[in-house]
Amino acid sequence: YLVDLNMKAAFNVAQLVVLKMLKNKKKGGSIINMSSQLGHVGMSGRNIYNMTKFGIEGLTKGMGVELATKNIRVNTVAPTFVETPMVKKFFKNKKFKQLALSNIPMGKVATESDVATAVCFLASDAASMITGTSIVIDGGWTAK
């Protein structure tokens, strides 16, 4: 299930989007994949999820290089835990919440706005020289 959702879907959608971008007279564009901080670091008990997010990061790098000559940029946004209803459910487990927050030097989870702002930046002309990389929104987790 996670492989289909996190990797195959991203690959298939990107392929369709690239075909549309190549037909567009303006040429070029920006593809933004959703990854996770766990595409940059491992976490016990999350092996399949880690694998799929590392896969998205690899896909992004490969496509970023391959499509650069077509003026198509490919990047990822890789957040930590984001304040959503799903994360709120996870955080009802006090041990899990403490473990997660203790790994985030800033001591808080990301907001939906934090993620949306990064996506808007990558989609904008301000990011015209950024491709094949990831913006990690994790409060310092992966910097440790």
Mark where each language-model region is.
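Catalytic Tyr-X3-Lys loop
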Residues: 1-11, 32, 49, 56, ...
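Active-site helix of classical SDR
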Residues: 14, 52, 60
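Alpha-helical segment proximal to the catalytic Tyr-Lys
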Residues: 19, 65-69, 128
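Residue(s) in the substrate-gating loop at a strand-loop-helix junction
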Residues: 36
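Short, flexible catalytic-loop segment of classical short-chain dehydrogenase/reductase
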Residues: 40, 57, 74, 78-89
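Active-site loop immediately N-terminal to the catalytic Tyr-X3-Lys motif
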Residues: 41-47, 69-70, 107, 125
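Active-site loop-to-helix junction immediately N-terminal to the catalytic Tyr of the SDR YXXXK motif
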Residues: 42-50, 62, 86
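C-terminal substrate-recognition "lid" of short-chain dehydrogenase/reductases
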Residues: 72-73, 109-137, 142
